[in-house]
């Protein structure tokens, strides 16, 4: 796995130090600007004019086992809402000039009337309830990983300079928490959160479901791909493939909440070093996300208490990255305004 350019990072750091601003005055914006420059391989960095969000949608067998505050039927309804441009992330994307693409990987609905380009990558309807059975077959996992990689290549070929990964699937925080637990070797009690806002009794039950899933998977979690088969889903596997391929192609990714970060952790297990191409858009309220970010060495750009999902936190952070680029590109050098300084 090639890393972002160290030489360009050094040049960007030198330029940052030479700006007509007090040392350290730009804080995290300076760090983000250096990272973007290194991923682009050029200093000053190019403006981020083409940013693409792909939302991977799918249902989860565990959603019918008391782990979510909402019924699985919401997933299909939200796919249609994305397409109408009326979802939360749709409003943010419109405000910030981010392209949105939604794909059905495993929605438990035929989505009649939905455009073929949304449905053509479908791997299966829903996934196995991970505390009782594997989420996917090995072949389905491979298919979903390749779909994600293909979609990343398509987005990059279309001109995307920055990629975002969004999610939609009732119950998806349960397999995502299991993926993080598997990747970090942690028990369910440390990674399980309230998702869409479940009460204390449901949280305890959700912890038990996640731990039962981990116990059932056993040593298979040593293999990241087999982990996806046992504990993931079609949408999470596709997101993992998308994130891994973005890193292979040398295109930066701004991560969203738990689902994106769980997939990023898994992608980094599959392709060690992939995390160098990722930045964390925001800190979610889910404990597993913070644990995975710490493992990946990523500090969130925003901390707003968001738990919407959909890619919303990453989209909200896009203007911050654009601001970072603008500062490194457009602020005068001290040597330009005070020759000889």
What are these regions (language model features)?
Residues 1-341:
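N-terminal loops that bind phosphate or other acidic moieties
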């Amino acid at each position: 796995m090639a890393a972002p350019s160290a030489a360009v990072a050094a040049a960007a750091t030198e330029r940052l130090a030479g700006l007509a601003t007090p040392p350290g005055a730009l804080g995290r914006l300076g760090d983000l600007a250096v990272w973007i420059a290194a991923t682009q391989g050029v200093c000053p960095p190019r403006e981020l004019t083409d940013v693409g969000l792909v939302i991977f949608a799918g249902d989860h067998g565990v959603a019918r086992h008391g782990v979510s505050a909402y019924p699985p039927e919401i997933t299909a309804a939200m796919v249609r809402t994305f397409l109408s441009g009326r979802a939360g992330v749709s409003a943010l994307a419109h405000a910030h000039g981010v392209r949105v693409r939604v794909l059905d990987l495993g929605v438990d609905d035929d989505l009649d009337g939905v455009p073929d380009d949304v449905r053509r990558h479908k791997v299966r309807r829903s996934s196995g309830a991970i505390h009782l059975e594997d989420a996917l077959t090995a072949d389905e996992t491979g298919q979903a990983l390749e779909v994600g990689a293909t979609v990343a290549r398509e987005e990059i070929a279309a001109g995307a300079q920055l990629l975002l990964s969004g999610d939609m699937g009732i119950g998806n925080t349960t397999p995502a928490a299991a993926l993080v637990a598997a990747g970090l070797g942690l028990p369910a009690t440390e990674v399980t959160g309230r998702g869409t806002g479940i009460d204390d009794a449901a949280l305890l039950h959700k912890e038990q479901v996640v731990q039962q899933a981990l116990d059932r998977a056993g040593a298979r979690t040593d293999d990241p791909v087999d982990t996806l088969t046992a504990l993931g889903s079609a949408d999470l596997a596709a997101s993992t493939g998308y994130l891994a391929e973005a890193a292979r192609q040398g295109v930066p990714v701004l991560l969203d909440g738990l689902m994106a970060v769980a997939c990023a952790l898994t992608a980094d297990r599959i392709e060690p070093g992939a995390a160098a191409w990722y930045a964390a858009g925001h800190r979610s309220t889910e404990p597993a996300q913070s644990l995975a970010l710490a493992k990946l060495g990523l500090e969130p750009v925003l901390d707003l208490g968001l738990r919407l999902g959909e890619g919303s936190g990453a989209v909200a952070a896009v203007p911050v990255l654009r601001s970072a680029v603008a500062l490194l590109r457009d602020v005068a050098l001290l040597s330009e305004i005070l020759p000889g300084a």
